[in-house]
UniProtKB/Swiss-Prot annotation:
Protein name: Membrane protein insertase YidC
GO molecular function: membrane insertase activity
Quaternary structure and partners: Interacts with the Sec translocase complex via SecD. Specifically interacts with transmembrane segments of nascent integral membrane proteins during membrane integration.
Organism placement in taxonomy: Bacteria, Pseudomonadati, Pseudomonadota, Gammaproteobacteria, Thiotrichales
GO biological process, one term: protein transport
Length: 551
């Protein structure tokens, strides 16, 4: 295959990889559940065999079973609630109706650049309901517990809210512990059996969400619509698995239950943010389901048998906040995997680590991207220089190649043979010019996911009109400059021998300008910087080569 053919193929491949393959990989090719589903069984209840002795890995239960009462968000409208504020949370509301956390806003994350209102991650607002609740279940039936506020006390800089309630012969004391600087909330329940017989109790910590944040908003040219929304979970046997809301909605209301096997967590994921329940017991089970097609629920439940006049303590950790690796890595095994950079996450994590350290020095993510690009070009300079020297040599051979084309214009086989002889005589590899592009592909993909998934770059400004590097350039200045840089770079490269190839190459800058117009401006900034450095390197090397090899 000719060098120009390969160069065109690589350029087109980059576009296809981002627009078609990479963008929807997780959604189009969900994780393989074959092994798990082979052990699935049908049970009459979500809470069947809730004790730790069960061996079932995954259970798909009957949609009509009494898993939990279907969520009625409107019941919180007139119910009393307690409001707590911390250094990171604004207006955390705990309903006295059942102890659910029905509201939590993030002080450090505004809704948008134009609306500086703190983003509500948990909310009971109609149309965007998303709550965290802890349900007490007796004999596989949820019981209604109305709580009373016992006040908030401060211990070691932490706010501790205590609620008490009783139902069905049980006395429940629930505490919520808030750390002023952290997004995790410790939820502990002390359940006392005041009856004369043993009681089988389950504590079900769950999320209920009244909508899919992604909805049907996928757009081929909207990079942010490629991000994952749905359920993620981890167990001792399965370190990380995801199920999209779209796939869960196809289960006809049948919940899926998974053994945690001693450790695990369950979470709702959306772009930049995660809410996770982390049970502290070793016999917890994880589940997820869809109710009535428009309410999604996921949680972890723990069972215990409480003897008469005895108590049982069951606790969990609730995390609701940004997907920042440093926040998650110590909370639970594999929780940091919710920061998912895709197939090339190893390279993405290295790139982000370097960018983060540079940002700590320069204080601007745009400058960090530029400096990371310079560093990458410096590392790969020996390979690039070799490629540019080969291209310079090819450029000097153009007159001889044109003469061969004129001589053998009616015999393509002979032309190909003569050109290969020329390349061999001059020790030129026509494919070497593709090497820099090959190197860029994994780096480009890795940086793409860093810019798309890292919450640190959400609403991060650069200069002038670029107020958010995670969003597209509002005036398309960077994509146009990137297209012009591609055009200039083509002028420095050897012209394609085939007129048709030349026309295709001529239109590629226009095509890529159009494609990059919808990409995050930080990514376009990287590509533009990369092109400008490449042009400078190629121009200097070409001039030097021509000056030292004149005949």
């Amino acid at each position: 295959m000719k060098a120009n053919h390969i160069r065109i193929l690589l350029l087109v491949t980059i576009a296809i990889m981002f627009i078609s393959l990479m963008g929807k990989w997780e959604q189009t090719f969900p994780a393989d559940n074959t092994k798990q589903q082979t052990s699935a069984t049908q049970n009459n209840s979500h809470y069947d065999n809730a004790d730790s002795s069960t061996n079932t890995d995954v259970t798909t239960t009957d949609a009509k079973s009494s898993l939990a009462k279907e969520t009625n968000f409107s019941k919180y409208d007139n119910a009393k609630s307690i409001t707590i504020n911390t250094g990171v949370f604004k207006d955390v509301k705990v309903s006295l109706l059942d102890g659910a956390i029905i509201s939590a806003s993030l002080k450090d994350y505004s809704i948008s650049l134009d609306d500086k209102t703190p983003m509500s991650l948990l909310t009971d607002k109609s149309g965007s309901e998303y709550i965290a609740k802890s349900t007490i279940v007796v004999n596989k039936q949820p019981i209604s517990v109305n709580f009373e506020d016992q006040g908030i006390k401060i211990e070691n800089g932490k706010q501790i809210l205590t609620l008490t309630g009783s139902a069905d012969g049980l006395q429940i004391t629930r505490t919520y512990t808030f750390d002023d600087t952290k997004y995790n909330i410790s939820v502990s329940q002390n359940i006392k059996n005041t009856t004369s017989a043993p009681v089988n109790v389950i504590v079900d910590d769950s999320f209920a969400r009244g909508f899919d944040p992604a909805g049907d908003s996928f757009s081929l040219l909207n990079a942010h619509s490629y991000t994952f929304t749905g359920v993620a979970y981890s167990t001792a046997k399965d370190s990380f698995r995801k199920e999209s809301f779209k796939d869960i909605s196809k289960t006809n209301g049948q919940p899926t239950v998974i053994n945690s096997d001693g450790q695990g967590w369950v979470a709702f994921l959306q772009h930049y943010f995660v809410s996770a329940w982390i049970p502290q017991s070793t016999n917890a089970k994880i589940y997820y389901k869809n109710l009535n097609g428009d309410v999604f629920e996921a949680g972890a439940f723990t069972g215990a048998t409480i003897a008469p006049n005895q108590s049982e303590n069951i606790s969990s950790i609730l995390y609701t906040g940004p997907i920042i690796k440093a926040n998650l890595v110590d909370l639970a095994p594999n929780l940091e995997k919710t920061l998912d950079y895709g197939m090339l996450s190893f390279f993405s994590e290295i790139i982000f680590w370097v960018m983060n350290h540079i940002h700590s020095l320069v204080g601007n993510w745009g400058l960090a991207i530029i400096l990371v690009t310079c560093l990458i070009k410096l590392i790969f300079y020996p390979l690039s220089a070799k490629s540019y020297r080969s291209m310079a040599k090819m450029r000097m051979l153009q007159p001889r190649i044109k003469r061969l084309q004129e001589t053998y214009k009616d015999d393509r086989q002979a032309l190909g043979k003569k050109m290969m002889e020329l390349y061999k005589e001059e020790k030129v590899n026509p494919l070497s010019g593709c090497l820099p592009m090959l190197i860029q592909i994994p780096i480009f993909i890795s940086l793409y996911w860093v810019l798309l998934e890292s919450v640190e770059l959400r609403q991060a400004p650069f200069i002038f009109w670029i107020h958010d590097l995670s969003m597209k350039d509002p005036y398309f200045v960077l994509p146009v400059l990137m297209g012009l840089s591609m055009f200039l770079q083509q002028k420095l490269s050897p012209a394609p021998a085939d007129p048709m190839q030349a026309k295709v190459m001529m239109f590629l800058p226009v095509i890529f300008t159009f494609l990059f117009a919808s990409f995050p401006s930080g990514l376009v900034l990287y590509w533009l910087t990369n092109n400008l450095i490449s042009i400078s390197q190629q121009w200097i090397i070409t001039r030097h080569y021509q000056a030292t090899h004149k005949k």
